[in-house]
Amino acid sequence: MSVSAFNRRWAAVILEALTRHGVRHVCIAPGSRSTPLTLAAAENPAFIHHTHFDERGLGHLALGLAKVSQQPVAVIVTSGTAVANLYPALIEAGLTGEKLILLTADRPPELIDCGANQAIRQAGMFASHPSQTLSLPRPTQDIPARWLVSTIDNALAMLHAGALHINCPFAEPLYGDMNDTGLVWQQRLGDWWQDEKPWLREARRLASDKQRDWFFWRQKRGVVVAGRMSAEEGKKVAQWAQTLGWPLIGDVLSQTGQPLPCADLWLGNAKAVTELQQAQIVVQLGSSLTGKRLLQWQATCEPEEYWVIDNIEGRLDPAHHRGRRLVAKIADWLEMHPAEKRKPWCVEIPRLAELAWQRVVAQRDTFGEAQLAHRIRDYLPEQGQLFVGNSLVVRLIDALSQLPAGYPVYSNRGASGIDGLLSTAAGVQRASAKSTLAIVGDLSALYDLNALALLRQVSAPFVLIVVNNNGGQIFSLLPTPQSKRERFYLMPQNVHFDHAAAMFNLRYHRPENWEELESVLAGAWRTPATTVIELVVNDTDGAQTLQQLLAQVSHL
């Protein structure tokens, strides 16, 4: 018997089973122990293959692919610390719902805990973070192929959101020519190989029932809070709220068009909070809210009912309101709960939103990161998409901009880390082949600098704006000790990104005013290549501008 040949047949069943559940993208890191999985993926024509030398970036690349494709994405890595590098992307997927299938090669059991090279305890290493965990045995013909394929099918059928970790031990030898070893074992799956359906088909009902008292609540004074959702859902939610006459507080990731812009400014005004206290019901569609003032209001509001609707399971309400947690796709829920045409009940909030917007517009000519956040709408590519980084960048765009309704916006707002942002953006672009604008801070770019390798070959224009404010300036918004702020919080690196772009043969520009930026963008959107644009801004201007605007709007 050829161990290497049967390893490959075992792996081929695993990879073929994944195709029956919509997996098309496979992300592969180099490794020897993962050879059976890698070769099975490489030889399966159903897959689009992506490779990267950095497993942490590879996991985030898969995350970006899953965000756009809305399908599970497989990741193949070798044994040892390569597996541990998938942890950040796995955690993010668990919080934001993208489906990742982590195929981690492992040493066989007899090589664990005995000093063998590159052998760690991989089974269960991700604790409670994967939605599903499957530890496969060492490949053997004593286990029928139908057990293997039905086990994979069962795990994927139970995967509603998040990651499935499949640990796959393989014994040596890992290399060798294919022969008839295991062929009969494989053929016992019959015409499954020619079919397109899973071996084991399971159905799971997820949608919430229609709320029978909706006809009563839709006649009340309500508020709509829109969190993360798809572009199509964002447009529907905006229309739904408008019909009801309810104010819509739209997050930067809501894609609703934010009809009441600058919410994180005007929510700091006591008049707005007082008017919102009249709401009898709050309907939150989508999770992962960004704005600090929005989260503060959410934590203190006490309507008669607070409903949270999202396709992801779990409470999703850090304020623990008394109300309803409804698990459903937002578009489906809206269809089951139609709006009834009513007059708007809020008077003060639209006025405050308009005044706040005017205050922001009055400062748009200054060259700085707060003004970039406000202007970002003007720089979006037609028929394209936006990827927003974390930390100060996303908060400024949320507070100061008004993104168009239905325009695709992506971000990692689950755990809200700055790791893997460039890799995720690369995955977003690869899955859509759309012109993409990504905007991150300098520390975020440094954290994922390896990902520039993923941006060397793109199918559509990709513009990466790095806002270089020389450190983690979000800490300027927090009451960090002044004497220790720079060394222990901001950690300025005093670097520029021209040499990084050159190392990966990417276009690079450092505009010094809006006219230069707009000229660079005009050229970038005409070329299917990556352009790195570094905006060097005064360190604290962005945070200070936000604080000044908050103070102004609070006194309107």
From Swiss-Prot:
Per the entry, the cofactor note is: Binds 1 thiamine pyrophosphate per subunit.
What EC number(s) are associated with this protein in UniProt? 2.2.1.9
Named in its record, the pathway it takes part in is: Quinol/quinone metabolism; 1,4-dihydroxy-2-naphthoate biosynthesis; 1,4-dihydroxy-2-naphthoate from chorismate: step 2/7; Quinol/quinone metabolism; menaquinone biosynthesis
Enzyme class, top EC level, equals transferase
Q: Which Pfam families match?
A: TPP_enzyme_C, TPP_enzyme_M_2, TPP_enzyme_N
Q: Which reaction does it catalyse?
A: isochorismate + 2-oxoglutarate + H(+) = 5-enolpyruvoyl-6-hydroxy-2-succinyl-cyclohex-3-ene-1-carboxylate + CO2
**A GO MF term:** manganese ion binding
Q: What keywords appear on the UniProt entry?
A: Magnesium, Manganese, Menaquinone biosynthesis, Metal-binding, Thiamine pyrophosphate, Transferase
Its GO biological process annotations read: menaquinone biosynthetic process
Q: Required co-factor? A: Mg(2+); Mn(2+); thiamine diphosphate
Lineage, top-rank taxon, reads Bacteria
- Cystine pairs annotated here are none
UniProt subunit comment: Homodimer.
Function comment: Catalyzes the thiamine diphosphate-dependent decarboxylation of 2-oxoglutarate and the subsequent addition of the resulting succinic semialdehyde-thiamine pyrophosphate anion to isochorismate to yield 2-succinyl-5-enolpyruvyl-6-hydroxy-3-cyclohexene-1-carboxylate (SEPHCHC).
Of which family is this protein a member? Belongs to the TPP enzyme family. MenD subfamily.
Name of this chain's protein: 2-succinyl-5-enolpyruvyl-6-hydroxy-3-cyclohexene-1-carboxylate synthase
Q: Which organism is it from?
A: Salmonella agona (strain SL483)
